[in-house]
Regions:
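AAA+ P-loop NTPase domains with strong preference for DNA replication initiators
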Residues: 1-59, 66-99
């Protein structure tokens, strides 16, 4: 929750971090489903993506991406950034644990 407080200090920074997280988990999903690097946002991190993707199933990755996207939308709609991030991080704590 300290991370939520620090990140919430700048709304724009929070949105940037959330977009980065969406891209990361999207890359994990793309790799998991296709094994291809051509569609990755971060092809230079393909080895790390390959290793990390093995810890998730597709359904969990979609849920994570949707949760982050929903939080991003709330912040863009002027919801309290800190509260949105705290709720997101608590939700993600149960989702990003290894399968």
């Amino acid at each position: 929750l300290d991370l939520a407080e620090k990140t919430a200090e700048s709304r724009d920074r929070a949105l940037c971090i959330l977009e980065t997280l969406i891209c990361w988990y999207r890359d994990l999903l793309i790799w998991l489903e296709s094994g291809e690097t051509g569609f990755l946002y971060n092809p230079d991190r393909s080895e790390e993506i390959r290793r990390e993707a093995g810890s998730y199933d597709a359904r969990r990755l979609v849920t994570i991406i949707e949760a982050i996207g929903a939080a991003k939308n709330k912040i863009e709609a002027n919801a309290n950034t800190r509260l949105v991030l705290e709720a997101l991080f608590l939700r993600l704590a149960g989702l990003v644990a290894p399968v």
